[in-house]
Structure formats: structure tokens, C-alpha cells
């Protein structure tokens, strides 16, 4: 069986890119990074648009595979972070650390996915750079906007963690819920959200920060992180 090659196009501060960086490091899967500077508009270049028509990051390009979607192509692109995370779970089920509960536990798997989707669908899209620019153009305060919506979203996450948290979001093993949680907290802290309002979320986040994979994936330690922001 051939080993897929992975190329990740992302931005150091993108929480969606951070999810994939954490997953790759947790699974010890090698990948090639391609920085895309969102502030310089590199996501709108013709070159990048040819790879990802949504002009967003991250983009995961997988090559050296049997491409059943487009058989004439030797590579396959995934332009949504949750889809990419699920792909890694399904494409490498036996030789990489699992980030979903066993298939024999569909309830726990659904709970993990619910937490992921609250973060990915209800929190991140309404607080990202694109929306912040729109809010500012309407004479709103993008920081207040982002902080208020992030606080609402994390309130929902906290309620779910009351049901399931052990050492991590769902029990005592790291799952995709934790992978999504960490970059979301990074983003929320940048707009001044008080994480102390959510004690279970705070505890799980701090537990995740102890993981070497999370430390390697931290936005302050990426090759495209500006020198003045590096840790």
C-alpha cells in the first residue's frame, strides 16, 4: 500500500489551519507546509484560486493516492478543515493515532462531532478575518463582535463538556473535539474573551497545552509567524 503525501496550505493565525497542524502532529504524520498570507491577500491570487476556488485556508492536498473522484488526477484537494480531519481518520485508520472514539461507540463519536461543529460552524465563521472586515466597514467594532459571539459559542461548548469531559473534551483520550477546541480558544483570547467563565473548557485547554503536538502547532511557532509575534 502506498503512503499518501500531504501538503497543507495555511496561515499561522488561522484557527482552521491550526486544527490540521495539531492533528498531523498528534498522528505523527509528516506533511509539507505552504504558508498563505491572508493579510497580503495571497489567498486571492490566481495560483491559489486554481487550487482552492473558495480562496480560503486551510487547503489539504493529498497525492500518491487512488483518486476515485477525478481518476485522471494524481492528487486530491480538501478545502474544508473538518472534512480534512475526517479524511485523515478514515484514510489512515490503522497506522495513526485515532482522534475519534471507537466505531463501536457511535454516541461518543456523535458527541465529538457535535462539539466540533459548534466550534467550526457557529463560532469560527462569524469571528474570522473576512467577517471582521465586513463589520468594520459597517462602522461596527469587530473585536466586540467577535468576543460576544465567541462567548456565546463557548457557553454552548461548556454545557456539552459538563456531560462528557474527563481529562479531555470527551473522556480521557484526545479527540477531534480537543483538536478543534484549542485553536478556537487561541482566537477567542485574542479578542479578549474571558476563558475563566468556562471552567471545564479552561481546564481541558490547559491540559491540551501540555501536549508536544499542540506546542509544535502553536500559531506563535510557525514558519510564517512574524518575528514580533514569535514565542
From Swiss-Prot:
GO terms for molecular function: glutathione transferase activity; maleylacetoacetate isomerase activity. GO terms for biological process: glutathione metabolic process; L-phenylalanine catabolic process. It comes from the Eukaryota. It catalyses: RX + glutathione = an S-substituted glutathione + a halide anion + H(+). InterPro entries: Glutathione-S-Trfase_C-like (IPR010987), Glutathione-S-Trfase_C_sf (IPR036282), Glutathione_S-Trfase (IPR040079), Glutathione_S-Trfase_N (IPR004045), GST_C (IPR004046), GST_Zeta (IPR005955), GST_Zeta_C (IPR034330), Thioredoxin-like_sf (IPR036249). Its EC number is 2.5.1.18. Residues 105-227 form the GST C-terminal domain. The keyword DNA repair does not apply. One of its GO terms (cellular component) is mitochondrion. Glutathione binds at residues 14, 43, 57, 80-81, 124, 128-130. Keywords: Transferase. It is an enzyme of class 2 (transferase). Residues 4-96 form the GST N-terminal domain. Homodimer. Belongs to the GST superfamily. Zeta family. Probable glutathione S-transferase. This is Probable glutathione S-transferase.
Amino acid at each position: 500500500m502506498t503512503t499518501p503525501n500531504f501538503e497543507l496550505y495555511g496561515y499561522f493565525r488561522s484557527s482552521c489551519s491550526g486544527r490540521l497542524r495539531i492533528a498531523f502532529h498528534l498522528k505523527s504524520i509528516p506533511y509539507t507546509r505552504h504558508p498563505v498570507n491572508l493579510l497580503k491577500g495571497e489567498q486571492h491570487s490566481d495560483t491559489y484560486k486554481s487550487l482552492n476556488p473558495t480562496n480560503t485556508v486551510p487547503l489539504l492536498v493529498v497525492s500518491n493516492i487512488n483518486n476515485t473522484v477525478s481518476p485522471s488526477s494524481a492528487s486530491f484537494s480538501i478545502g474544508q478543515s473538518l472534512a480534512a480531519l475526517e479524511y485523515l481518520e478514515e484514510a489512515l485508520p490503522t497506522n495513526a493515532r485515532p482522534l475519534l472514539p471507537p466505531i463501536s461507540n457511535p454516541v461518543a463519536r456523535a458527541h465529538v462531532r457535535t462539539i466540533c461543529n459548534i466550534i467550526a460552524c457557529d463560532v469560527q465563521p462569524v469571528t474570522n478575518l473576512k467577517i471582521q472586515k465586513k463589520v468594520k466597514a459597517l462602522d461596527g467594532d469587530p473585536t466586540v463582535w467577535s468576543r460576544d459571539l465567541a462567548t456565546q459559542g463557548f457557553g454552548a461548548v461548556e454545557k456539552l463538556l459538563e456531560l462528557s469531559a474527563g481529562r479531555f473534551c470527551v473522556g480521557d483520550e484526545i479527540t477531534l473535539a480537543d483538536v478543534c477546541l484549542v485553536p478556537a480558544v487561541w482566537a477567542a483570547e485574542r479578542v479578549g474573551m474571558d476563558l475563566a467563565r468556562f471552567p471545564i473548557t479552561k481546564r481541558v485547554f490547559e491540559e491540551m497545552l501540555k501536549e508536544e503536538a499542540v506546542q509544535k502547532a502553536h500559531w506563535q511557532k510557525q514558519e510564517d509567524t512574524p518575528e514580533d509575534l514569535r514565542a
